Amino acid sequence: MNSINIRAYEASDYDEICLIHDTARKIELSLASLDDAFLPFSVASKREDFFEYPNIDVAIMDGRIVAFSAYTQEELAWLYVSVDKMRHKIGSAMVERALQKAPEINYIEVLVGNEPAKKLYESFGFTVHSISSGVMPGNESFSVRVYCMTRRS
């Protein structure tokens, strides 16, 4: 595997993370049978205050951004990997980075149906604490069910 460099987000990364989000999010929503709930990153990031997260990282491989994440001290809230780089351990590298920078992270929500993401987080000690129903953040006209995953820090 080629080496992965993870660094803090820079404003010049915006277009690349839009593309990563928009392609990967469609897969995530399809797994949860929520295809019609898609919003492009340019909209979702504003509605969900993405740029207010204190930690936003990007992963670079072969000279291009291939993943991004956003998190607080308690929650890993966003993690998307470029579709062509899924299953290359990049998601794992991003989770490792987040847990190194914010070791108190103990909460993640995963859409029910997104089993690949659930398995990724389980490999880091997260377990399903409950399944919660509500509305999709940033797109409240859609009902969602999420795995509420926790871990001991």
Positions of predicted regions on the chain:
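Conserved N-terminal entry element of GNAT/NAT acetyltransferase domains
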Residues: 1-12, 147, 151-153
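Conserved beta-hairpin
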Residues: 53-67
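A conserved beta-strand-loop-helix scaffold within acyl/acetyltransferase catalytic domains
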Residues: 69-74
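A short, internal acetyl-CoA/4′-phosphopantetheine-binding micro-motif in the GNAT/acyltransferase core
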Residues: 76-87, 111
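Conserved active-site alpha-helix within GNAT-family acetyltransferase domains
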Residues: 92-93, 113-131, 139-142
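Conserved GNAT acetyl-CoA-binding A-motif
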Residues: 101-113
